[in-house]
C-alpha cells in the first residue's frame, strides 16, 4: 500500500472535476434546432430575448448529465481500486525479486568461499609434504641423541657402583713411603738427644765451610737406614731389606 496515497489524491481530484466537466454549460436547444435564425437576423436589428427551454428538456438534459457523471466516477473508482489492489502485488513481486537477487549473491559468495578454502587446503597439503622429511630427520636425531644419553648414564651408573666401598672390592693398602729429610728432622726433635750417632759429626765454624756435600749426604743416608731398621723391630715386624 505504498502507492495508495498519491492514487487516492488523484481519485479525489477526478471526482471533484468530473461533475464540472459533465454538468458544464450546454448550447440551447433552439439554437441547435434552428441554426438559420441566427444567420437571418440583421445586424441593425436587436436580438430577440431567448426563451427558456421547456421543463421536459431541462429534466432530460439533467438526467443525461447525471448518468454520464455517475458512469465516469464509477469508471474512475474501478480504475483506482484496480491500481490499489495491484500495488501490493507489485510490491510483493519487487520484494521477491530482491530476495532472489540477495539469494543469488549469497550463493555466489558461498561458491567463492568454497573455492578459497579448497585452494588453502591445497597449499597446506603442499607444505605438509615438504615438512614431512624434516620431521622425520628431527625425530631420528632425537632418537639417536636419547640413545647416546642412555648409554652414557648406564656407564656412569656402573662406574659408581664399582667405585663404592664395601661391595667386595679389595682396596690395596698404601705402601710404606720413604721418609724425607724433613720428616727425619721432626722425629729427631721428638726423640731427643738420647740416641747417639754411629759416627757423630762435629761441626764447627771452620769445618762447616770446608765440608763437602757428599759427606752430608752420607750422614743422612746412615740416619735414614737406622730409623728404617728400628721401626719394624719395635712393632714386631721383620726389618725391611734395602
From Swiss-Prot:
Bilayer-crossing regions = 65-85
Q: Quote the cellular component terms of the Gene Ontology held in the record.
A: membrane
Which InterPro entries does the annotation name? CCDC107 (IPR038779)
How is the protein disposed in the membrane? Single-pass membrane protein
Localization per record = Membrane
Concerning PANTHER family, the annotation shows: COILED-COIL DOMAIN-CONTAINING PROTEIN 107
Q: What is this protein called?
A: Coiled-coil domain-containing protein 107
Source organism? Mus musculus (Mouse)
